[in-house]
UniProtKB/Swiss-Prot annotation:
UniProt keyword annotations, A-Z: Electron transport, Heme, Iron, Membrane, Metal-binding, Mitochondrion, Mitochondrion inner membrane, Respiratory chain, Transmembrane, Transmembrane helix, Transport, Ubiquinone
Family annotation (CDD domains): cytochrome_b_C (cd00290), Cytochrome_b_N (cd00284)
Gene: MT-CYB
Source organism, top-level taxon: Eukaryota
Origin organism lineage: Eukaryota, Metazoa, Chordata, Craniata, Vertebrata
Molecular functions (GO terms): metal ion binding; ubiquinol-cytochrome-c reductase activity
Membrane topology summary: Multi-pass membrane protein
Assembly: The cytochrome bc1 complex contains 11 subunits: 3 respiratory subunits (MT-CYB, CYC1 and UQCRFS1), 2 core proteins (UQCRC1 and UQCRC2) and 6 low-molecular weight proteins (UQCRH/QCR6, UQCRB/QCR7, UQCRQ/QCR8, UQCR10/QCR9, UQCR11/QCR10 and a cleavage product of UQCRFS1). This cytochrome bc1 complex then forms a dimer.
Organism of derivation: Macaca mulatta (Rhesus macaque)
Name this protein carries in UniProt: Cytochrome b
Residues bound to heme b b566: H97, H196
Family under the similarity heading: Belongs to the cytochrome b family.
Needed cofactors: heme b
Summary of the function given for this chain in its UniProt record: Component of the ubiquinol-cytochrome c reductase complex (complex III or cytochrome b-c1 complex) that is part of the mitochondrial respiratory chain. The b-c1 complex mediates electron transfer from ubiquinol to cytochrome c. Contributes to the generation of a proton gradient across the mitochondrial membrane that is then used for ATP synthesis.
Amino acid sequence: MTPMRKSNPILKMINRSFIDLPAPPNLSMWWNFGSLLAACLILQIITGLLLAMHYSPDTSSAFSSIAHITRDVKYGWITRYLHANGASMLFICLFLHIGRGLYYGSYLLLETWNIGIMLLLMTMTTAFMGYVLPWGQMSFWGATVITNLLSAIPYIGTNLVQWIWGGYAIDSPTLTRFFTLHFILPFIIIALTTVHLLFLHETGSNNPCGISSDSDKIAFHPYYTTKDILGLVLLLFILATLTLLSPNLLNDPDNYIPADPLNTPPHIKPEWYFLFAYTILRSIPNKLGGVLALFLSILILAAIPMLHKSKQQSMMFRPLSQFLFWLLITILLTLTWIGSEPVVQPLTTIGQVASMMYFITILILMPLASLIENNLLKWT
């Protein structure tokens, strides 16, 4: 008799995607982050829905509604901190997922990679809007600085900013539309994630060696489901530890001060996961140039498949490329550190050098290293 998972139309889809899915036999723990991202997304939607039931998207009551959630709502404090720290965990998993894609050459699965970039942009947009909602000092000034960047667009910039604001300054209409978009975007992210998986299952997963595994596959369940559950337990342990022992470790103290348009904080900065892009923005003295560099720092990921010059897909057997990959990680960590600091010397110069090195490493050094490695292969 045919098992129900193979005959029922709905269960059949789940079976093909998560149970009988043929998978390479040598996937490492780096392949866990896709399922962890799904877990983080589900957690964010559940906690977000619970918070939305008590939140008031109006400048006069937004800050107090957050205080009300934290103090008066049953388990409101843990819901709020799970949501805030869950976003940090989501971005950690996201960056590691992208890093794995770069290291093992998964970007050569073009459709999957490009939808992944769209997911990254959408997640960053959602997170930025979520940062504005508590209506603290950093929420208000962060929103002012970031939305003002659009005024650098020639001709339509000023009108575009006023259209986003819903007036001549950030006020209740801005907060209402940000809340609406912050609520709806995660559901669009789920739809895009489904398309991401659809394209991935069309080609099959890449593997650490970067070679075809068509001749040797294993079932996804129970091997990789067990592995994913272990990753999920570790993720939940880290999230629970962070939320229960140090919930404000990754938050900004200025956001516990109600938004005041007449009082600018000494150092305006976004959440930690945007700091690398924020440093690149700050490194260029020209406003339009800074905005272009900011967008290019993310969109450069779309150019990586075109910059792949190696005869091998994975970096596993390419020491020069490995060195440049870890150099790139060091540059990104440096950019994150500089973004969290005020604009003073010598930090500004370090930020400018790191920003320049970020683009040079990806656009010039990595393709060059691949060509050198191709020539070295001829001598072996």
